[in-house]
UniProtKB/Swiss-Prot annotation:
A Pfam entry, by short name: DHDPS
EC number: 4.3.3.7
Protein name per Swiss-Prot or TrEMBL: 4-hydroxy-tetrahydrodipicolinate synthase
Biological role: Catalyzes the condensation of (S)-aspartate-beta-semialdehyde [(S)-ASA] and pyruvate to 4-hydroxy-tetrahydrodipicolinate (HTPA).
Annotated pathway: Amino-acid biosynthesis; L-lysine biosynthesis via DAP pathway; (S)-tetrahydrodipicolinate from L-aspartate: step 3/4
Gene field: dapA
Catalytic activity: L-aspartate 4-semialdehyde + pyruvate = (2S,4S)-4-hydroxy-2,3,4,5-tetrahydrodipicolinate + H2O + H(+)
Organism placement in taxonomy: Bacteria, Bacillati, Bacillota, Clostridia, Eubacteriales
The organism's place on the tree of life at top rank: Bacteria
Site (Part of a proton relay during catalysis): 43, 106
Example of a GO biological process term: diaminopimelate biosynthetic process
Active site: 132 (proton donor/acceptor), 160 (schiff-base intermediate with substrate)
């Protein structure tokens, strides 16, 4: 387990595949800038448009480069339970520290099926599981009562909570906050979720502000709550600009503007609208990230 900021890392692409040279640079940059954990092949990493072999290679490569300096979390969840088990087993074999398992999307399921999905994955592996709740993308919600039940599974240790509903997060903390670590899945709610006993954030913002996102959490944990809150508010407009279009379109665009060689987005993701690009550039300039 970790406390603090986990970057939901973008995946740098070339026209033909993954840019491993740039990926290595990004991994080292995050460790140097105090990122507390690294998630690969998640939503921000465009995992849904990577091939199975690409995901396996990125997980293996990242584990080897990071070499236990910080935890590496592998995004292995899909809407196919069998496929999720296969990739989770692979992540365990190559030394990932945790897997991130999203709720089934598109085909979705019932609450009974949701429990069966996570339970089957839990029983097939021996590695910590972080659940991922993002109803806006999946059409499914892990309710507080369901989380209370899932928290009893032996490998389920955490949840990335991106419902945006602080009342729901509070109920989760009340029911099972002593058995499961709750991480904010939204950069605009880091401090509010920390105030409910949260353990940190799985962050898009950390792709461009790794140390600052770490500091929001670190200062809170040190009891410097006002300083933590001030940082949350300082970067609020920038964080919001990263969601002006579908994530990870803005953050990958931002990183390329910042002279990281992150390459293209994969269809169906595409270049930003000019009007939104102007807003993103203004926020990057305001924070000294581009000239």
């Amino acid at each position: 387990m970790f406390k603090g900021s986990c970057v939901a890392l973008i995946t740098p692409f070339t026209e033909d595949g993954v840019n491993y040279e740039e990926l290595r640079k990004l991994l080292e940059w995050h460790i140097k800038n105090h990122t507390d954990a690294i998630l690969v092949c998640g939503t921000t990493g465009e995992g849904s448009t990577m091939t199975l072999e690409e995901k396996k290679e990125v997980i293996k490569f990242s584990v080897e480069v990071v070499n236990k300096r910080v935890p590496v979390i592998a995004g292995t969840g899909t809407n196919n339970t069998k496929a999720s088990i296969e990739l989770s087993k692979y992540a365990e074999e190559v030394g990932a520290d945790m897997v991130l398992i999203i709720t089934p999307y598109y085909n979705k399921t019932s609450q009974k099926g949701l429990y069966a999905h996570f339970s089957a994955i839990n029983d097939a592996i021996n590695i910590p599981i972080m659940l991922y709740n993002v109803p806006s993308r999946t059409g499914m919600n892990i309710t507080p009562l369901m989380l209370d039940k899932l928290a009893d599974l032996n490998n389920v240790v955490a949840i990335k909570e991106a419902s945006g509903d602080l009342s729901q997060v509070a109920k989760m903390a009340e029911l099972c906050g002593d058995r499961i670590a709750i991480y904010s899945g939204n950069d605009d709610q880091i401090v509010p979720i920390l105030s409910l006993g949260g353990a940190g954030v799985v962050s898009v913002l950390a792709n461009i502000l790794p140390e600052e996102t770490h500091n929001i959490c670190e200062k809170y944990f040190l009891g410097e709550v006002i300083e933590s809150r001030n940082l949350q508010l300082k970067y609020l407009s920038l964080a919001n600009s990263l969601f002006i279009e579908t994530n990870p379109i803005p953050v990958k665009t931002a990183m390329n503007l910042m002279n990281f060689n992150c390459g293209p987005l994969r269809l169906p993701l595409c270049e930003m609208e000019d009007s939104n690009l102007i807003i993103l550039e203004e926020n990057l300039k305001a924070n000294g990230l581009i000239k």
